[in-house]
Amino acid sequence: MIELDFVDDGAIACATLKRPPANAFTADGLRQLQETVGALNANPRVRALVITGDGPKFFSAGADLNTFADGDPAVARAMATRFGSAFEALSDARFVTIAAINGYAMGGGLECALACDLRIAETHAQMALPEPSVGLLPCGLGTQTLPWLVGEGWAKKIILAGVRVDAATALRIGLVEDVVDTGAARDAALALARNVARQSPHAVAYSKELIGLARRGVPRSAALAVERERFVDLFDTSDPREGVAAFLGKRAPQWHTDGEQDR
């Protein structure tokens, strides 16, 4: 289900969700997503991951509902574990993750986008968590990630009342960061990923970790202590020296990743 390619000398990975007609997730597809993120985590050259759907209509329609047709609790538990594990891996990735929402992002498809750091939607995109309408609930982090982005009220409208959100509304409520023309989400996400790749790799990784502390409700005093430690930790790398030297020398910095030798 995951079609992977790389651009910019491997700095940016592009994962396409490809399972016609609606790019719906199966257990195997979720396992593949988790394994893909794990492999990219082990590749220090990768600075960002762009995820999009194959075709012009669907980012992903979420779970294949045929999986739950028999009402088997064992299947439900296995799939909930798969969804949770895959999207937790995506959320906790070392690199920056960007969802290029090229169409419908429904149920687990929207949860996949919610697990990413940033989201860009095309003007025709539609987003929803309609699981309660078929007797299910979001089990891929959605009940936790959505309120963080849009607040409790909108999260309840989307989940409890089954409200579908268009791209303009998603931008207004903070569900996505940008809205672009039809067919332009992947290129816009790549442009944002290139911005990420120009930053210090260690500073970005530490900053992502620190923002995650706020999201998880870590007490402010504890999070600020970690913030100070991570600032000092940067000086165990070459990034501060290179960054300041590049700024003063009016040139682009040449960053080193953990897989390369620091100066």
Predicted regions located by residue number:
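Glycine- (often His-adjacent) and acidic-residue-rich active-site loop
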Residues: 31-32, 53-89, 105, 133-135, ...
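Terminal peptide-recognition signature
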Residues: 15, 33, 51, 64, ...
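C-terminal alpha-helix plus adjacent terminal tail
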Residues: 1-12, 44, 56, 162-168, ...
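Crotonase-fold acyl-CoA enzyme core
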Residues: 89-204, 233, 237-238, 242-245, ...
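Conserved CoA-thioester-binding segment of acyl-CoA-metabolizing enzymes
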Residues: 1-52, 88
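Alpha-helix N-cap/N′ positions at the starts of helices
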Residues: 63, 150, 171, 223-226
